[in-house]
Amino acid sequence: TLEFRVDANGAFIYEEAKMLLQELAELEIHSIEQPIKKSEVKNQKPEDSLMAKLCANTPTPIALDEELIGIIDYEEKKKLLETIKPQYIILKPALVGGFSGSDEWISIAENLGINWWITSALESNIGLNAICQYTYIKKNLLPQGLGTGALFTNNFETNLVLKGDEMWMPNNS
């Protein structure tokens, strides 16, 4: 089966997003990333967060992406997820504190029943290789977003091979 995810990059205002979420549900879209711009929840009550309102009443699952970037304090991460309660979070290790920062997000998300997946953020093949290995040890069965290496014209050679919808590393590597 083919599964579609939509990345809005915060393009919609709240009212537009509410309508769009209904339309996407009718199309059986897996999820939408960051439908409205990043919100500030540090000093906000859950009932005042527009993203939390969307996540609480959405017919299409919402994944936070840009919302996670720049938050390094464990308690702030926890408050963000407890406040917004998204269906998914998307982790770009290079932008969320590396592998240790990703581990914190994963731990908090799993404790709150929030699913997650990992994507790359324009890493070269060296960075992509490390992220692929990190993702593998996490044993998350959701499709991950790890295909940016081919975008570069001047990149390092890689031993990673895409077979169907899976990334493989030959045994002799």
Which stretches of residues belong to each language-model region?
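Metal-dependent enolase-superfamily TIM-barrel catalytic cores that perform enediolate-based chemistry
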Residues: 1-58, 69
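Hydrophobic faces of well-ordered beta-strands that scaffold small-molecule active sites
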Residues: 2-8, 32-34, 62-65, 89-91, ...
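Catalytic cores of alpha/beta
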Residues: 14-24, 70-84, 100-106, 124-139
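Glycine-enriched alpha-helix->loop->beta-strand junction motifs that scaffold or abut catalytic
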Residues: 22-30, 53-62, 81-89, 108-115, ...
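A polyampholytic, Gly/Pro-enriched intrinsically disordered region
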Residues: 61-62, 85-93, 164-171
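Short coil/turn segments
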Residues: 67-68, 94-95
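Active-site capping/gating regions of soluble enzymes
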Residues: 84-89, 95, 101-117, 121, ...
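Flexible C-terminal active-site loop/helix
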Residues: 121-173
